[in-house]
């Protein structure tokens, strides 16, 4: 009889008393060789520790290698790139923005540490050889496909955040053309790991932690060549094994809303194994219901002049904010029906440049009522929405949703609509934001917020600075 495996439950830890012998020993054992694992290995090695990385893949990279590797940095007067572009960025503005963006779930200590250490973070990366060009990509875009560095990767210029802190671009892209930042970043990080003589074991699956009766972590059980090996970690285990976007059972259990999105962002190893290993020894997993969800409705940026409406023909968000914030609110709508309506001319080269994939489902040349009927919206609703929007847009204001004047103009016939309803073809990529509760210095915490000795977590295995898609900015996880 085959007993189904519950892939949403923690693994049972191995008791220290049951370990007959150690197959391997190291000072620091790191689980996962993506961006966070590489950074942890470099830092630990530079502090004099013997470090061993275990990764289930056959090469380094993780989800970082699949990303654009934008990193959100600033404050302290500005990074070298910000200053070269004539920008001054205060730590307090950066802090206030991130606190507001993460709302009531924000961790003030983590946000403060992130902002105050951001300039050092930038300089550390530059010291490792990560290239950043001293240029600004001053366009509304999801990523810079040129080798320019600096761009807005959040909702800093949009309501309500533009009323909280002075906007400043903080997304830093590597000096490489195309969407190739992730591979280059991991190449550089891997070279730095190798240069330090860090031991790396690939095709090694971490199974469970080894703990004593006081729940102190002493090591980890790893499967290598189909054999279980007990690894002693004299100074600690660091879990850098990613999130759980690839684990359907964990998504159903903790974050079912994300199942409405279309495609997980990550690598096959993002199964939540690191989170489960931590939970098994008493770690608190927090914010597990939250995830990043994107609706990449720009480029072309001209679609920002359009409006997004729901099944009631009503707007629900200021369309000039970050695509992640829009994606979050799209999933909250009645029946999740969402349409993007814009002047025909503003669709521009949509079919060539867009990532969205949404289909045209209605056009109107004679009247808004015609479009309303084609979209099967309640009679009069869309007509009223557009009439109110146009009246205010003509005056450069949006009292309902506070879209900035830069992106306000009346909607004029002919109009067209894209079906952005989840499940109808529109691209809704997602990843998870929940993870193990940690101190800003990485120590894993219990539900009572006591430290589990010998256990640390980073990357998406930990619940870090970002806490909600509604305020997410690319480059903070």
Feature annotation, model-predicted:
Residues 72-114:
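Glycine-rich active-site loop/strand segments that organize a redox cofactor
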Residues 180, 225-296, 476:
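Glycine-rich loop(s) and the adjacent beta-strand/alpha-helix scaffold that form part
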Residues 1-28:
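Extreme N-terminal leader/targeting segments of oxidoreductases
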Residues 28-53:
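N-terminal Rossmann-like FAD-binding beta1-loop-alpha1 element of flavoenzymes
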Residues 4, 208, 216, 381-469:
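A glycine-rich dinucleotide-binding beta-alpha-beta segment and adjacent secondary-structure elements
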Residues 271, 275-277, 281-381:
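An anion/pyrophosphate-binding glycine-rich loop and adjacent beta-alpha core
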Residues 46-66:
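Glycine-rich FAD pyrophosphate-binding loop
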């Amino acid at each position: 009889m085959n007993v189904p495996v519950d892939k949403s439950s923690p693994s049972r830890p191995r008791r220290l008393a049951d370990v007959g012998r150690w197959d391997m020993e190291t000072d620091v054992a790191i689980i996962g060789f993506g961006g966070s694992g590489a950074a942890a290995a470099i830092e630990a090695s530079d502090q004099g520790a013997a470090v061993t990385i275990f990764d289930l893949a056959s090469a380094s990279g993780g989800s970082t290698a699949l990303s654009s590797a934008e990193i959100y940095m600033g404050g302290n007067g500005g990074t070298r790139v910000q200053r070269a572009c004539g920008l001054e960025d205060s730590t307090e503005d950066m802090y206030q923005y991130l606190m507001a963006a993460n709302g009531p779930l924000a961790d003030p200590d983590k946000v403060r540490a992130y902002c105050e250490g951001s300039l050092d973070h930038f300089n550390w990366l530059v010291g490792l050889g990560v290239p950043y060009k001293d240029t600004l990509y001053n366009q509304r875009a999801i990523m810079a496909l040129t080798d320019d560095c600096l761009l807005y990767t959040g909702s800093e210029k949009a309501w309500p955040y533009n009323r909280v802190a002075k906007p400043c671009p903080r997304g830093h892209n590597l000096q490489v053309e195309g969407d190739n930042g992730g591979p280059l970043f991991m190449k550089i990080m891997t070279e730095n790991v190798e240069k330090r003589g860090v031991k790396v074991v690939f095709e090694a699956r971490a199974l469970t932690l080894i703990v004593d009766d006081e729940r102190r972590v002493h090591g980890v059980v790893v499967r290598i060549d189909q054999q279980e090996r007990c690894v002693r970690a004299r100074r600690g285990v660091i879990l850098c094994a990613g999130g759980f976007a690839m684990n359907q059972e964990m998504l159903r259990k903790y974050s079912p809303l994300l199942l409405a999105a279309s495609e997980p962002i990550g690598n096959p190893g993002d199964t939540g194994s690191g989170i489960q290993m931590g939970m098994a020894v008493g770690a608190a997993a927090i914010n597990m219901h939250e995830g990043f969800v994107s609706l990449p409705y720009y480029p072309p940026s001209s679609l920002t002049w359009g409006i997004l409406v729901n099944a009631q023909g009503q707007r629900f968000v200021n369309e000039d904010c970050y695509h992640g914030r829009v994606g979050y609110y799209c999933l909250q709508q009645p029946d999740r029906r969402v349409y993007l309506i814009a002047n025909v001319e503003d669709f521009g080269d949509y079919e060539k440049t867009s990532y969205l994939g949404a289909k045209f489902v209605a056009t109107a040349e004679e009247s808004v009522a015609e479009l309303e009927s084609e979209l099967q919206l309640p009679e009069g609703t869309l007509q009223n929405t557009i009439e109110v929007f146009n009246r205010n847009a003509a005056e450069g204001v949006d009292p309902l949703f506070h879209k900035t004047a830069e992106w306000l103009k009346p909607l004029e016939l002919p109009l067209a609509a894209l079906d952005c309803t989840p499940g109808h073809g529109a691209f809704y990529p997602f990843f998870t934001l929940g993870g193990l509760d940690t101190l800003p210095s990485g120590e894993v915490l219990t539900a009572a917020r006591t430290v589990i000795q010998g256990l640390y977590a980073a990357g998406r295995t930990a619940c870090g600075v970002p806490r909600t898609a509604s305020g997410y900015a690319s480059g903070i996880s």
